Amino acid sequence: MRFKDFIKGDTTLELHKELNQKLWRCTPLAKDICPPGKLHQEIKDKLISLAYYWAEYAKLDKNIIKDIILTGGNANYNYTSSSDLDVHLLIDKDKIKCDKLVDDYIVDKKNLWSANHNIKIKGYPVEVFAQDVNQDTPADQGVYSLLKDKWITKPKKEFVDVKSKSFKLKVKHFVDQINYFIDNKIKDLDAIEKLKEKIRLYRIAGLKHKGEYSYENLVFKELRNLGYVDKLKDYANKVIDKKFSYDND
């Protein structure tokens, strides 16, 4: 979807009555009432196998893996056609030497894996990551244990008017800043990184305060779905490449 279509009234965000039925089993209680069920068995098995394979790739010992969870849009009611399957290995970082460096290492492994693989389940990309077992998740965000085959936290339905003028203005505020840097070919890396960090912290503040359906998180998701998060990241990488390249001809 183009940004001008968003301004006219369209949105990339969705809120459903049920979880994604391509992935989840459901036994309706009544018409339009379908509680969160279990993940389809064959999908669960595939994701567990992939998670352990990724752990070997990342050189994470199996004994530090405490659980494997599914979270993100496809474990909630706000999934879209572009939502990932977010598979996280919960690891005991206390059992890792140089645990202060492990976060950067895991992020690097995730990014390298994503650059070289395109794994999909029912048409949805699978993103694998690892996080500390004690790391909190937003209270209203669905979290499903693949190993235990049950919900750790069941997803909740909340309504946010994503077509309101105030919501659109906030998205436009960030879009205008991103476009300003790119259109004016701003080369100030510190300023670019500050904008990236501003957007990241804006989202984190919302997740901590009100969770998955926070105003701030939905603004971020709209920016991401419209392509502006990647647009800013790609521009920053181009500026870095140009800064450190040299041609004497």
Q: Each predicted region: which residue ranges?
A:
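Short acidic, low-complexity intrinsically disordered linear motifs used
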Residues: M1-D10
